[in-house]
A protein has these predicted regions:
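Flexible, active-site-proximal loop/turn residues at the rims of small-molecule/cofactor binding pockets
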Residues: 27, 56, 79, 146, ...
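Flexible mid-to-C-terminal extensions adjoining Fe-S/redox cofactors in radical SAM and related proteins
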Residues: 204-207, 222-311
Length: 311
């Protein structure tokens, strides 16, 4: 991404009232202007997260990331054993490297979370939890497999490792819900969002519409803004995100966790905003209907469950 345009884009994000930015890839640690961009984001008051495979992390780089206020490192984990993870990543010794640098990350006051894409490399979720806990992670989030996307994002693969039938995916979601009941380890996916994903698989109507394009956006390396990385819809350049017309159309095209999970969290806040807007327009009954929607209480309970994202 052009660094000057990215800098202007961050300023536009600030003007738009956006509260956080997540740097992902590819591998964002390869971007030569990453540190200066993170520093600018923090100066503008944006919360910062970074997704990486961790291979390029060094003690000096961790200190640099800490110095510019990075709050969360999300590190990709592919399997429940050192051998399987390193082989799939194609980086011999990667697991040992992560085990060495994770204490340094935590000492630098950066939260360290494991991101695990559901795949056939994972045979036992309990073994997976033990693996990421032993490495030194403080929590994990499950990402759902993507076999195809319509945006420019390349984080998908039409591969048997991540190709599942609806029945197989439903079983995965059931296992995650069971794991959350049994495990003391922090699993960041909210129960309500996992249950919504199961409803979607079964063709049931969604209760919590996706807020991508309204509260969350995806910008690619060309700094073109998409409503999300599943759909092809583009909204304009990042430098103009403060002038983009948000999209709110109750989309149910995918179950991508990084949009659907926070959409559950923010449902009650959006309902409150709808209530206040209705009252300002003199639509009192409509406002109370929005305020007293029972889904608001489920959303608030889910937000308490997701407090680890907010700490």
């Amino acid at each position: 991404a052009d660094p000057a345009r990215l800098a202007r884009g961050l300023e536009a994000m600030h003007r738009a009232g956006i509260k956080y930015v997540c740097y992902t890839g590819g591998e964002p640690l390869l971007y030569p202007h990453l540190i200066s961009s993170l520093a600018q984001a923090r100066r503008l008051g944006l919360e910062t997260l970074l997704v990486t495979n961790g291979a390029l992390l060094t003690p000096d780089l961790i200190q640099s990331l800490s110095a510019v206020g990075l709050q969360t490192l999300i590190i990709s984990i592919d399997a429940a054993t050192e051998e399987a993870h390193d082989r799939h990543r194609g980086v011999p010794g990667l697991t040992s490297h992560l085990q060495e640098i994770l204490p340094l990350i935590l000492q630098a006051n950066i939260k360290a979370l494991a991101s695990v894409t559901l795949s056939r490399l994972i045979e036992d979720l309990d073994a997976l939890v033990d693996f990421v806990r032993d490495l030194g992670f403080t929590g994990l989030t499950f990402s759902y497999p993507l076999t195809g996307l319509s945006s420019s994002y390349l984080g998908c693969a039409d591969n048997h490792l991540v190709s599942f039938s609806p029945e197989e995916l439903d079983q995965w979601f059931a296992q995650i819900l069971d794991l959350k009941k049994r495990s003391s380890f922090v699993i960041l996916n909210p129960r309500l969002a996992v249950k919504e994903a199961r409803r979607q698989l079964r063709g049931l109507p969604g209760r919590f519409p996706c807020l991508a394009g309204f509260k969350y956006f995806f910008a690619d390396w060309r700094l073109e803004v998409y409503r999300c990385h599943f759909l092809a819809d583009t909204l304009g350049p990042l430098e103009e995100i403060d002038r983009i017309t948000p999209v709110r159309d109750n989309c149910n095209a995918c179950s991508i966790d990084c949009y659907r999970d926070p959409s559950v969290f923010q449902y009650s806040a959006v309902s409150l905003a709808d209530t206040l807007s209705a009252w300002r327009q003199g639509k009192v009954i409509r406002g109370f209907k929005s305020l007293l929607n029972p889904q608001n209480f489920l959303s608030l309970r889910s937000l308490m469950e997701g407090r680890h994202w907010l700490q």
